[in-house]
Amino acid sequence: MKEQQKKKAAPVLVVLILIVLVGAAGIVSFLINRYKPGTEYMAGNEYFNLTDENSVALIQNGELLEEQAVLIGGEPYAAYTYVESQLNSCFYWDEETKGILLTTSGGVQTLLPGDAAVAKTPGGQPAVQQESDGTVYISLDVVKEYTDLDYAYYSDPNRVVIRNEWDGVEQATVQSDTAQVRQKGGIKSLILADVQKGDTLLYLENLDNWCKVMTADGYTGYIQTEDISEPEAIEARTAKKDSYERITRDHKINLVWHQSTSTESNDAMAEMTAEMTGVNVISPTWFSVTDETGTISSLASADYVKLAHEAGREVWGLIDNFNEAFDETTDLAYASVRSRIIEQLLAEAASCGMDGINVDFENLKEAGIPHYLQFLRELTSAAHAQNLVVSVDTPVPQAYTMYYQRGEQARFVDYMIVMAYDEHFAGSEEAGSVSSLPFVQQAVEEMTRVMPADQVICGIPFYTRVWTEKFGQSAITSEVLGMDGAKNLSLIHISE
């Protein structure tokens, strides 16, 4: 009986053992699969969103852009709009000539679509190409020649890696013999690229066990923290932009504007400045653009310049845009208008012997800034050829005038004059200082954020406003007083 029971129990035991073994194998297999890194790769074209053989992905400062470049004749080109807004605004599309104007320290070059005479790619193609849909493209190799950036092109899949920002950039080195950069932070995530020991990666973000990185050839993904070194800062580099040599003075500029509206005003200059001390530059309001073709009016006087020079002062003739017949937003878009203004100014400068030009174009609209910048580039290039200083007046940087691109202006011109006054003006809703100390401090601080301190001249007012507020009324009025008037008013109140 017992023998029979043993015989019956044996198969059951075997089955139980088999069940345990199968279960254990399943658990082991599950655990192995769970912790085994995935081996599947993500297709490069899918990662870079490339849909055809001529599309080129753009990776800028570690970010894959929606914007894409194109291959033309096997070489990478980027749309003009991208180049101008993201890489180098010196590439300026001129609607009148239907070409790209490139202003450098050597002058202005005109790059016409399809013309390789002025500039061409390493492969001999024109620097600028225009597609049938009207889109204008610029060779990235040509852009690199004139722009402060690092750039590399890779094929299979087509992509361009660009860096034009270096502040706060860190890198890490691969320490494992082999490692993978994955699409997401997890061992099952798709592999984007294999990396080898010693490879340098752009370090973007720390996520504990995983770090966000970018490979040298443009793949941004995640790598296990244990596979790389501690991040280290990349040494700051000196900008390699085209060097626009400034014409500067080895002393501080102490400038006064002279409101000169007639020949009589010119004649009064010597008497007005006879007892003036410390001033080494005088800027008379001699020139104004009077119409849409770029005609300028002039009160320039060689005798005025001679007297100023005898007193040890330079003369920087001022040109304004105050005539309503001239609209800089639309009129400066024409190369012929810009050229006409510049030619007349330089002819006047040569005739009267003045030392510089002061540009006082005010109330600029955002739409006109690209054309204004191009005007300044062309003016400075031509003026420097005659050894003339170029200075530009600009309002105090405020949120609503940031579109002035003061840093870009400062790339070309010699001095930037911030008009640190009119904090409160005739139309202000409240009484207040024309130029309070905090207002002036802010002006200087904001200017020196985007340009060297020795390029900034701070304009302060030699006038004030006396405000009148009537009891029970919300309206306020003001009267402008010059220095003498302010002094006399102060003496009256002191005596009272």
Each model region followed by its residue ranges:
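Primary recognition of N-terminal secretory signal peptides and signal-anchoring hydrophobic helices
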Residues: 2-207, 237-248
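SH3/SH3-like beta-barrel fold
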Residues: 198, 211-215, 223
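Extended acidic/polar, glycine-enriched regions
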Residues: 222-238
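Glycan-recognition patch characteristic of GH18 chitinases/ENGases
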Residues: 235-339, 344
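Hydrophobic faces of well-ordered beta-strands that scaffold small-molecule active sites
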Residues: 254-258, 280-284, 315-319, 357-359, ...
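Short acidic catalytic loops
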Residues: 282-288, 349-365
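Substrate-binding surface in catalytic domains of secreted glycosidases
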Residues: 292-299, 343, 366-490
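Conserved small/polar residues in nucleotide/adenosyl-binding loops
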Residues: 492-496
